[in-house]
């Protein structure tokens, strides 16, 4: 039975930085810098605890962020100096100005439940993007039934994975052991088909590429991650 405290994915902010401590942020940021280049104002959708915002702000970008979790928002505010950070949903957020670039890293769009929701979030984001602006959406594309176990600085994480082809859903039950306490929560990732993503993107006045591995390699349905890079035509 899922621990009531942690059945909601967005309540695990206390563990987020612990288990992302050794994530290759340098590689991610090199990729992002290459994609957004000379853009000045960046919006981070699903900013989490604010690591990307912190790096972008420190190299001179004007940044804003939003997250559905109030806990994440409060943690993110401690990592930035001037950034505005909002508690909001990517499906219907409203911000009073447009951005030159929009990023959404670490599988945020996988938390949507359908292609209709993906398109709704995409349309909303394009409405907030300047002409000739760039949007980067980082998607988890793993269809796995293999369990995962890892240890970070003595803290343990055991993840049970189940993929449902019928619903295009990756279901993960995650157990965190911090010291002597174990916490459990469950979340579902909607896994997108490359062809369907292309069909949606073709409806809009955009140029796009589906990449993988944080380099300029074309993604396919076997790629572990898909990075959707979109340019809003001017």
Task: Locate predicted features.
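A short beta-strand submotif of the Rossmann-like class I SAM-dependent methyltransferase core
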Residues: 104-106
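SAM-dependent methyltransferase
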Residues: 136-200
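Conserved class I S-adenosyl-L-methionine
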Residues: 1-48
